[in-house]
Design a protein with these regions (language model features):
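Conserved alpha-helix/loop element of class I SAM-dependent methyltransferases that forms part
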Residues: 73
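Short secondary-structure boundary/capping elements
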Residues: 62-69, 148, 152
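Short, surface-exposed acidic-centric catalytic microdomains
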Residues: 40-46, 50, 70, 127-129, ...
Length: 242
């Protein structure tokens, strides 16, 4: 039996991507294999000794946690929900734990929405049978400050394509057409019908999003390559949601 390390568990509304606006329970896992310069979840970068549970009441639970224990914690969030968002950090770093947790949640009737940085295909392979949605956050060098990992992205997308999949690109003022074309061609190799979401970066730590005109240009540049492109900013910071 493996154990997991969780940053927090809470009930809120999905603030980005294709399912923006739906009610979800969120499980934010600790640790990440990347170090993006404009990361907006710094609290999830390292393992922690306890995690918060925020629903109708606010309580704390000790780490590490068993799959059965975490499923029980989720059952305390009694709000109606569309799905459970498995997020991070990078949740696939705890793939063996997810392989124990997700079957339990599926037996309880939950729909599983996985948010991943799309760099750990072997870990996704372990759990794909229990996932319903994959939000693949393909990282651009202009936004992260790190080289893109397109080969890992390609392999993961081929696995994820058997489920409901979309690709998210966080874009900044400096994002180039060449980056967008490369990312678009990567997605088209898997399927031209995979939706691609352009998400303007949250102004944080010096990050600047593209202006409205440039976002339209970016959408057109991607639209030459794949069938469905959407510009969707994060809504939870605007509305004060978690």
């Amino acid at each position: 039996m493996t154990q997991g390390n969780v940053c927090d568990v809470f009930s809120s509304i999905q603030g980005e991507g294709i399912l923006v606006g739906v009610r979800q329970a969120f499980v934010r896992f600790s640790e990440c294999n990347l170090n993006c310069r404009f990361c907006d979840t710094q609290e999830a970068k390292s393992r922690v000794s306890k995690f918060s549970v925020k629903g109708n009441e606010h309580r704390f639970h000790s780490n590490p946690v068993t799959a059965e224990g975490l499923a029980e914690v989720l059952s305390l969030l009694r709000d109606p929900r569309h799905s459970v968002s498995i997020t991070g950090g990078e949740p696939l770093l705890q793939g063996d734990f997810l392989a124990e947790l997700l079957p339990i949640l599926k037996r309880q009737g939950e729909e599983i929405y996985l948010e991943t940085n799309a760099t750990l295909p072997e870990e996704l392979e372990k759990i794909i049978d229990w996932v319903d949605w994959v939000s693949a956050d393909v990282k651009l060098e202009s936004a992260t400050g790190n080289p893109a990992m397109y080969e890992e992205n390609r392999r993961l997308l081929k696995i994820a394509a058997q489920k409901k999949l979309f690709v998210k690109l966080v874009v900044v003022k400096e994002t180039t057409k060449e980056e967008l074309v490369e990312a678009g061609e990567l997605v088209r190799e898997v399927s031209r019908r995979i939706a691609m979401i352009l998400q303007p970066v949250k102004p944080l730590g010096g990050a600047e999003p593209p202006d409205g005109r440039r976002l339209i240009e970016m959408a057109d540049e991607l639209g030459e390559i794949v069938k469905e492109v959407r510009v969707i900013p994060q809504i939870h910071p605007i509305l004060g949601w978690r």
